[in-house]
From Swiss-Prot:
Highest taxon of the lineage: Bacteria
Chain spans, region Disordered: 1-20
GO CC, alphabetical: cytosol
Record PANTHER family: POLYNUCLEOTIDYL TRANSFERASE, RIBONUCLEASE H-LIKE SUPERFAMILY PROTEIN
Family to which the UniProt record says this protein belongs: Belongs to the YqgF nuclease family.
EC numbers on record: 3.1.-.-
Name this polypeptide is given: Putative pre-16S rRNA nuclease
Subcellular localization: Cytoplasm
InterPro entries: RNaseH-like_sf, YqgF, YqgF/RNaseH-like_dom, YqgF/RNaseH-like_dom_sf
Length: 177
């Protein structure tokens, strides 16, 4: 889980099974939010949450994410972990990890995972531009699209790690046979 992790988590490890997942792209000004369908196949944008200057457990951004997790009945939350192309972590990764730790305390027992999000914002911006979205006022949409990229990558990797209808515990038992 987040508290002891140095790097990103791997999908399928301690998998909670069927249910919606929420992904967040933590920025210094905004937080992009995406959700999956209950079967964990498709990621879709939810909203962009303004980032609060407060850093406590009752900060408005944390409260809004908690409400979204509750509203969507999420079984897992994935937080994008920005790393360099060499896999190193800088200031942005520290901010995302700190946010993930605060969120974990607020939504327990729902697991909060870190996922490598290299180039998701670049990919999201390019995809929006190619679909004809104008640059002006695009930042909130880019944040949501980046969260979709983070979540879709997690879901795709999870589908390779966990067969439909089985949890990671089932897969581990199967490997012991």
């Amino acid at each position: 889980m987040v508290a002891t992790q140095q790097g990103p988590d791997r999908p399928g490890i301690d998998d909670p099974g069927r249910g919606r997942r929420i992904a967040i792209d933590v920025g210094s000004v905004r937080i992009g939010v995406a959700s999956s369908d209950p079967d964990g196949i498709l990621a879709t944008p939810v909203e962009t949450v303004p980032r609060s200057k407060e850093r406590g457990p009752d900060a408005p951004d944390i409260r809004r994410i908690i409400a979204i997790v509750s509203e969507y009945e999420a079984v897992e939350v994935i937080v994008g972990l920005p790393q360099t192309l060499r896999g190193e972590q800088g200031k942005a990764a520290g901010i995302a990890t700190a946010f993930a730790k605060r969120l974990q305390r607020a939504v327990e027992p729902i697991p909060v995972r870190l996922s490598d999000e290299r180039l998701t914002t670049v990919t999201a911006a390019r995809n929006l531009r190619e679909s004809g979205v104008k640059a002006r006022g695009q930042r909130p949409m880019i944040d949501q699209a980046a969260a979709v990229e983070i979540l879709q990558g997690w879901l795709d990797e999870r589908s390779r790690a966990v067969k439909p209808g089985e949890s990671s515990k089932d897969a581990a038992l199967e490997g012991d046979l």
